[in-house]
Regions:
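N-terminal-proximal low-complexity accessory segments that begin disordered
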Residues: 2-76, 81-93
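Catalytic or ion-translocation cores adjacent to nucleophile or general acid/base/metal-coordination motifs
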Residues: 2-9, 362, 382, 389, ...
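Catalytic alpha/beta active-site cores
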Residues: 2-3, 81-84, 88-403, 409-418, ...
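Short acidic (Asp/Glu) and glycine-rich catalytic loops that position anionic groups and cofactors
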Residues: 16-19, 38-45, 62-64, 149-153, ...
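Short, well-ordered alpha-helical packing segments
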Residues: 22, 37, 41-44, 62, ...
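Generic structural "secondary-structure junction" signal
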Residues: 27-28, 340, 397, 453, ...
Length: 471
């Protein structure tokens, strides 16, 4: 079936994408719809030829490298000659002087908190919600449901709750507390009643008092004690009315760990976004995450429920250095969400340029995913610093990093954002980036927030680049 396009500002935009941008993404951003399409088209037509030139240079380099290997097949490999050749064709760049990264307004999840990072397909709303909500997770559930606890001595996983396995979970968890939140004297195994908090001070003596950072009472009962280690938090839940807590001599119902600190919501390798319909599914889910209203109806074991983004977690601050502070301590309830756009190679028929060619998909991704982030700037439920985190994959060398920086600058101009609002995660997964990594970082020094390696892509490019080096 022939797809319907809307003609606007020298672009042919798929109707489903056009409606999404105009009716869903732009309202609430103070951006004028007509101005957006005018400026967007101008940038697309300006940058598309530059994008294409970079891809042609990739091809030229590969042809040159293949030819060099074929021409030198019968000679003993000479490392020095090979390196000089790579420099001559512009593959290896002269390394410049030392410099410092200048990225500003980075969230704590990036700069100060060590922890796991998830990657999920943005086209699957359930996976996206689960990942965003994985900031906090039950240690009891994780232990009970995995082979961390051996299925021996009657501790097998069964269809129904196995008390023997549950005891092993509790034993493991108490050892975890002794290791990570040690008491001054004794063990968490010896605690026989729910602790108390008086004027912000914990009734238990810790080896490191500063580890106790917050608490929560529900009515007159202590519900949570919040501890910190290495900037990660441990929340001990108490509940004498729950099936677990009422059998626990200390009333501990669960131990909640701060877990997935960041999540990459992926528009690239984990999805197949080949047309406007596919892209809009991903864009809509990302917009819902940025607005905070993404939710799905689910059914499990005959029970219907709504899955949505978890709220922030609220505590009362603990006493620190002799000062009592009854103010509120707010912990982020969700993983910091990053967005992986596609690389420079892909094009997509969702938008056609004035010559009928497909739009470079990375340009489209940069504009529309950033546009959706503007909604988060009002609530700051994702980025507290009003930053946009875009992970950019499959860049080949410093010139492509420069192009990414230019693209992000153009997006900021069109969307009227402060300079360097968009931060860049560099995926070091191409050989030309690895050997010129310092210069790639230099060209994104005001935006870079991480370096990451996709080892499968990196291995693949190593093989592809040197394919003709073999016998």
């Amino acid at each position: 079936m022939k797809k319907k396009y809307i003609n606007i500002e020298n672009l042919s935009v798929s109707e489903i994408l056009y409606d999404f941008v105009n009716k869903d993404a732009i309202p609430g951003t103070n951006i004028n719809i007509q101005n957006f399409w005018y400026k967007f088209s101008k940038v697309v037509h300006e940058l598309s030829p530059k994008n294409e030139a970079l891809l042609k240079f990739r091809q030229k380099l590969q042809i040159d490298i293949d030819k060099w290997h074929l021409d030198n097949k019968d000679k003993e490999f000479n490392q020095s000659e090979y390196e000089n050749f790579l420099k001559k064709i512009g593959y290896l760049i002269q390394e410049g002087p030392e410099f410092k990264i200048k990225t500003k307004n980075i969230d704590n999840e990036i700069s100060n908190i060590p922890g796991p990072q998830l990657v999920v397909p943005i086209t699957n709303s359930r996976y996206a919600l689960n990942a965003a909500n994985a900031r906090w997770g039950s240690l009891y559930d994780a232990l009970y449901g995995t082979d961390v606890i051996p299925e021996t001595e009657g501790a097998e996983r069964t269809n129904k709750y196995n008390p023997a396995r549950g005891e092993k979970v509790i034993e493991y968890a108490r050892n975890f507390l002794d290791k990570n939140v040690p008491l001054l004297n004794g063990s968490w195994k010896d605690i026989s009643e729910i602790p108390k908090v008086f004027n912000g001070k914990l009734s238990l003596d810790l080896k490191e008092k500063k580890q106790f950072v917050g608490y929560l009472y529900k009515e007159t009962n202590l519900y949570s004690l919040l501890f910190k280690k290495n900037n990660l938090h441990i929340d001990i839940n108490f509940n004498l009315k729950s099936s677990i807590g009422k059998k626990d001599k200390a009333g501990i119902n669960d131990i909640i760990l701060e877990s997935a600190i960041t999540t990459i919501m992926d528009h690239e390798d984990s999805v197949a976004g080949v047309d406007a319909e596919d892209k809009v599914v991903g864009y809509k889910n990302w917009l819902g995450l940025m607005k905070g209203n993404l939710q799905i109806e689910m059914e499990k074991d005959g029970r219907k429920f709504t899955r949505k983004l978890n709220p922030d977690r609220f505590y009362t601050k603990a006493e620190q250095k002799g000062e009592v502070d009854y103010s509120e301590l707010i912990m982020h309830g969700r993983s910091l969400m990053l967005n992986r756009n596609v690389g420079h190679l892909m094009t997509n028929p969702a938008i056609l340029l004035r010559d009928g060619s497909e739009i470079p998909e990375g340009i489209m991704d940069a504009f529309i995913t950033t546009l959706s982030c503007i909604h988060d700037f009002k609530t700051k439920k994702n980025s507290r610093t009003s930053s946009v985190y875009i992970v950019k994959p499959k860049m080949h060398g410093p010139d492509e990093a420069t192009f990414t920086n230019l693209l992000f600058s153009k997006v900021e101009e069109v969307l009227e954002l402060k300079k360097n609002t968009i931060k860049c995660g560099i995926m070091d997964e191409e050989r030309r980036t690895s050997v010129n990594l310092k210069e790639c970082i230099r060209n994104l020094q005001d935006r870079v927030f991480f370096i990451n390696t996709g080892f499968l892509d990196r291995t693949g490019d190593e093989i592809h680049t040197s394919m003709q080096a073999g016998p």
